[in-house]
């Protein structure tokens, strides 16, 4: 909605102004700067004086028309006076339009500006700068566009300043090239904001900007930093197939509508810390080449990371997921960090990663974790509904039948899924399938006797059958054993070779702590009708006792 014009300021401008049309309500009158050699602005010059002034202009002339009110015909006369006969397009030198008012259509298409100053200008009609070229900077600070604005295919070889600009209707920056910095700090976009296929070679600054309608950045390229911190997207935020070649920051941004980053490429770091996604968050087929941070983010709507690829760590520390979540299938060449996150709805995680960290993660509904390669730390995780951790032997398959590519894990030979810790977990609703438990720390786990083990779940074993303690041979009966027992026995003065002392996080655990663990696992195996496994843990229980 177009905002009403503010009342005239009683304070005169910093330049000698025209003063035409003064009234008690407007003691300053026209604020247009004097045309050189005259005491009136361009709009209020006598016709003969205006014609003489325009006739004296040549392409590339510097002009100063600050505060001047322009009609469409007056602007057309000015641009015709500086039209370059070689190109057929107007060519302005350093141009000063600060605080001017363009009362009708402002047509600057294909104009070349050696320097453009449009600070605090009001465009009451539509404004078009399509295919314009702004050499040595373009300043639109605190400028108001009351109708549509078009910058399609414009080129900004220098910096472009749109800080606190107000676009009250739609604005199009399609296919624009910003070679310098593009600064839209605290800008307000009340209508649609179209930046499709725009190229930002310098920094793109949208910090604290407000997009009240849909914002399109599809296929845009950000070659330097992209800063959207504290930005608010009230409509859709569309960054599909956008490329971020340097760091991208969306810290504390708010997405009221859908946020779509499908097939986007983040070649460096991507920061979404403390961001809020109230609509759906789509990161399907998105590629993250650097560190990806979603810590303390809030996801109110649905979340998709199908076929997303992370070359390094991705962090969801203390993130909140309020609805159903489908994370994956995704592939991560580093760690997926979900520690402290809260999942309020049903969860399906399909993850191929080196490590999955879920320390103190809260699961408030059912959860299914399908994993490849990962070492999983589940210490002190909280879940009150069934939770299943399953190791997948083959690559994940998408809905269309295509396997998920795992190039970032191509050098990893061992595809086993290992559980590193279940300490502090209530295992009453936990199901483990086909996972390696040889490194798993169990002491401190509650209701371990209700743990369900399915498929092939492997434990560590005692050392090979014959070892020597000093000169005497020592025989070991082969059985399943806990990582804590390995650590404790390897720490004894009389330990034989084969016990593993390097069990990370085992701490000070002895027979008194291990005996109840063996007892609970024995019962779990007995309830699962696995008598040989139960016998192994019976021997462990007796040995600890």
Where are the predicted features?
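Conserved positions within tetratricopeptide repeat
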Residues: 452, 515, 519, 531-539
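Short Cys/His-rich metal-coordination motifs, predominantly Zn2+-binding knuckles/fingers
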Residues: 20-23, 30, 44
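Cys/His-rich zinc-coordinating "finger/knuckle" motifs
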Residues: 25, 37, 48
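Cysteine-rich micro-motifs
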Residues: 35-44
């Amino acid at each position: 909605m177009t905002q009403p014009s503010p009342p005239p300021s009683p304070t005169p401008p910093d330049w000698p102004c025209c003063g035409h049309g003064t009234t008690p309500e407007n003691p300053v009158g026209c604020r247009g700067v004097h045309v050189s050699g005259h005491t009136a602005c361009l709009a209020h010059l006598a016709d003969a004086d205006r014609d003489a002034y325009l006739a004296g202009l040549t392409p590339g002339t510097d002009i100063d028309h600050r505060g001047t009110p322009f009609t469409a015909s007056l602007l057309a006369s000015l641009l015709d006076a500086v039209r370059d006969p070689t190109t057929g397009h107007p060519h302005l030198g350093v141009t000063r339009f600060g605080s001017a008012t363009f009362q009708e259509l402002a047509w600057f298409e294909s104009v070349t500006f050696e320097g453009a100053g449009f600070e605090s200008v009001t465009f009451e009609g539509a404004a078009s700068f399509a295919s314009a070229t702004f050499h040595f900077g373009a300043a639109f600070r605190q400028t108001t566009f009351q109708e549509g604005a078009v910058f399609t295919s414009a080129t900004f070889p220098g910096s472009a300043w749109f800080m606190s600009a107000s676009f009250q209707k739609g604005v199009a920056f399609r296919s624009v090239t910003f070679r310098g910095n593009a600064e839209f700090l605290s800008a307000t976009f009340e209508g649609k904001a179209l930046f499709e296929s725009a190229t930002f070679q310098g920094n793109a600054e949208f910090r604290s900007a407000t997009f009240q309608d849909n914002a399109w950045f599809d296929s845009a390229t950000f070659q330097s930093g992209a800063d959207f911190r504290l930005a608010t997207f009230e409509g859709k935020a569309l960054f599909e197939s956008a490329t971020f070649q340097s760091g991208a920051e969306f810290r504390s941004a708010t997405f009221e509508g859908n946020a779509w980053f499908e097939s986007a490429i983040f070649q460096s770091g991507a920061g979404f810390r403390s961001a809020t996604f109230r609509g759906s968050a789509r990161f399907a087929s998105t590629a993250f080449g650097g560190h990806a941070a979603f810590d303390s983010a809030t996801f109110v709507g649905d979340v998709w990371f199908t076929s997303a690829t992370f070359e390094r760590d991705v962090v969801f520390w203390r993130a909140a997921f309020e609805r159903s979540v489908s994370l994956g299938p995704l592939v991560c060449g580093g760690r997926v960090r979900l520690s402290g996150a809260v999942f309020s709805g049903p969860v399906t995680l399909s993850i191929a990663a080196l490590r999955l960290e879920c320390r103190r993660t809260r699961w408030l509904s059912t959860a299914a974790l399908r994993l490849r390669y990962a070492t999983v730390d589940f210490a002190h995780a909280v879940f009150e509904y069934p939770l299943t951790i399953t190791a997948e032997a083959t690559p994940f398959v998408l809905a269309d039948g295509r396997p998920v590519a795992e190039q970032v894990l191509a050098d990893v030979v061992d595809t086993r899924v290992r559980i590193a810790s279940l300490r502090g977990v209530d295992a009453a609703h936990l199901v483990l399938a086909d996972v390696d438990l040889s490194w798993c720390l169990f002491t401190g786990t509650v209701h371990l006797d209700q743990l369900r083990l399915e498929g092939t779940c492997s434990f560590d074993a005692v050392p090979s059958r014959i070892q020597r303690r000093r000169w005497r041979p020592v025989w070991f009966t082969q059985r399943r054993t806990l990582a804590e027992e390995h650590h404790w026995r390897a720490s004894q003065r009389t330990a034989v070779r084969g016990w593993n002392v390097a069990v990370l996080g085992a701490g000070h655990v002895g027979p008194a702590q291990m005996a109840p663990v063996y007892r609970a696992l024995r019962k779990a195996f007995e309830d699962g009708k696995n008598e040989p496994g139960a016998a192994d843990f019976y021997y462990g229980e007796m040995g600890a006792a």
